From Swiss-Prot:
Residues 514-581 are annotated as: Disordered. It comes from Arabidopsis thaliana. This is Probable hexosyltransferase MUCI70. Its EC number is 2.4.1.-. Pathway: Glycan metabolism; pectin biosynthesis.
Length: 581
């Protein structure tokens, strides 16, 4: 066998015998068909067996099913592996010089697998568990059969001597029921969720027209942008000189008063008297619970403070009745009417933690409990802003002419404001605006909830008053309609006679003094001396003694004389005797 190759067990390869019996491997590439292994024969037999009992179509469907199952299991396995390796880099493939891939570094031990499963479940909890949605007040209805559900206004009394506006009945709930119905959650604010306020340092005074150092000088572009309602907004809203209202911003308030105002977290009743224009009027019919829980704040200037000290005994406790008197320094305007617009429209900035506010002008006297008022006109209506409409006028154009006729403001300024609104689309009021019942409010009373959308409304309303005239009745409908065009929010307007039910209008201080001067003084005469005793016979009913000695009967009055004559005529009637029959 010298010179012949020895067949080895390497599936047909030959070994070359070298010198000294050393066998050298010879790598020969052959094209001859190798003998199939036993395992391969078994697989081929299974395939032939399947093909024998099933047709080609069924075999194809079976293979397609198997391939789909393999792909599905593979995707499931890969997806699970990605979840378990979240937060880590992608696994790298390591080659150690062999023809295969080493997956040993990619396999996980049981401990690692359990740890990853725990992490996966924890992360799944984080994804599934969301914070609860904000809870909003959705309104309520009084129980069926409640008297207020069927309450209707009676017709006005027919009094020709009194033709002006007058109060009408209102169906209030008892104080205890009104307190129980106070909402525990804020009302929904459409579109607007976050509202912040602009302050400028230094102050930019460049604008087209209008504005002030207190309210800022927003341009017309800023004005238009403020009516584009978004989820988050930042607008001018007074106090532009600093981030804290009342601290070196104009309309400055003592620090002790500011701290007390921050503690008001429920209802605040606010009013103001500047330039000693009115007397401070004590609220009436206020429940003990309201006195303890409602904040009553009266804002005055230094002139009014001096009068209160002299006439009402205002001292260090800063109280006049249930009013807490707050003295305002560094007033931003020379016109007292403009200064009064600050607490009237920006009360939410001065009381940042209050939920509800009731504003009444200084000329008014509150005569109904605040809880009853808010329940009737705000909570029961599911409204966030309520104001009474004017008792007579519904059209802004008519209201502007009435202001000009009464000399309420400079006529040229009123005309300029009305023309500006007309160019923006202001039209006379008509039934086409229903359910809006009026374009002219009676702004001496404002009921509101401090939510973002109502706060925005009063901010933009104040900006109009700051830019144009101080007659807020003229700018009210423009601001309301611009906000309503972007949201489904609007203002609730109730009857003027209903407003007159819970506030009583008094005369201004100057009018009271004028009436006092016109009233004639009462003469201070000494008391008259006592009258002498009457004579014995002075009555005309007693018989009078005549000179002849005869007594004449007393003179009869007209009625007695007529009755006597009737009796005499009856006596002269003929009498029919029985014999004459």
């Amino acid at each position: 066998m010298t010179g012949l190759g020895v067949r080895s067990s390497s599936y047909g390869s030959l070994e070359k015998t070298g010198l000294n019996g050393v066998v050298l491997p010879i790598q020969i590439t052959t094209t001859t068909r190798t003998k199939p292994s036993k395992m391969q024969k078994d697989r081929e037999g299974i395939v032939h067996w399947i093909c024998k009992f099933a047709g080609r179509k069924k075999v194809g469907m079976l293979l397609l099913f198997l391939i789909s199952a393999v792909v599905f299991l593979r995707v499931l396995y890969v997806g699970k592996g990605e979840d378990s390796q979240e937060g880590q880099g992608p696994p790298s493939l390591h080659f150690n010089g062999s023809s295969g891939v080493n997956y040993s570094n990619m396999l996980q031990t049981n401990e690692e697998l359990n740890m990853n499963i725990g992490n996966i479940s924890f992360k799944a909890k984080e994804v599934i568990v969301f914070p609860p949605p904000p809870i909003h007040f959705l309104g309520y209805s009084l129980p069926q059969g409640h008297p207020c559900n069927s309450f209707t206004l009676p017709p006005p009394p027919a009094d020709r001597k009194r033709t002006g506006p007058r109060p009408c009945p209102v169906c209030y709930l008892p104080v205890e029921e009104a307190v129980a119905l106070m909402p525990n959650a804020p009302s929904f604010s459409p579109v607007l969720k976050n509202l912040t306020y602009i302050y400028e340092e230094p102050l930019n005074r460049e604008t087209e027209f209008g504005g002030s150092d207190f309210g800022g000088y927003p341009t017309l572009k800023h004005r238009n942008d403020s009516f584009d309602i978004k989820e988050t907004m930042s607008v001018h809203c007074g106090f532009v000189k600093g981030p804290q209202p009342g601290r070196n911003t104009g309309f400055d308030i003592d620090e002790a008063d500011l701290l007390e105002m921050k503690q008001c977290r429920g209802i605040v009743v606010a009013s103001a008297v500047f330039d000693a224009f009115d007397d401070v009027k004590a609220p009436q019919n206020i429940s003990k619970y309201a006195e303890e829980t409602v904040c009553f704040y009266m804002f005055v200037d230094e002139e009014t403070e001096s009068i209160l000290k002299r006439e009402r005994g205002l001292d260090g406790n800063k109280k006049v009745g249930i009013w807490r008197v707050v003295v305002v320094h560094n007033l931003p305007y020379s016109d007292g009417r403009r200064n009064g617009k600050v607490p009237k429209l920006l009360v939410h900035r001065m009381f940042p933690n209050a939920r509800y506010s009731l504003w009444i002008d200084g000329k008014l006297e509150l005569v109904v409990d605040p809880y009853q008022i808010l329940e009737r006109f705000l909570w029961r209506k599911n409204a966030t802003f309520a104001i009474s409409r004017h008792y007579k006028r519904f059209d802004v154009l008519v209201e502007a002419e009435a202001n000009k006729a009464a000399g309420k403001y400079d006529n040229a300024s009123i005309d300029f404001q009305v023309d500006f609104y007309k160019n923006e689309g202001l039209t006379p009021y008509s039934v086409a605006k229903l359910p809006i019942t009026s374009d002219v409010p009676e702004g001496c009373v404002i009921l509101r909830e401090h939510v973002p959308i109502s706060n925005l409304f009063t901010c933009l309303w104040f900006n109009e008053v700051d830019r144009f005239t101080s007659r807020d009745q003229i700018s009210f409908s423009t601001v309301r309609d611009k906000i309503a065009a972007k949201t489904n929010w609007t203002v609730s307007m109730f009857l003027d006679c209903e407003r007159r039910n819970f506030v009583v209008q008094r005369y201004h201080r100057a009018e009271q003094e004028r009436f006092a001067r016109q009233r004639p003084p009462v003469p201070n005469f000494p008391p008259p001396p006592p009258s002498p005793p009457p004579p014995v016979l002075i009555s005309s009913d007693l018989p009078r003694k005549m000179s002849s000695g005869r007594a004449t009967p007393p003179r009869r009055r007209g009625r007695d004389r007529r009755s006597g004559q009737r009796g005499h005529r009856k006596a002269n009637l003929p009498v029919r005797l029985p014999d004459s029959a």
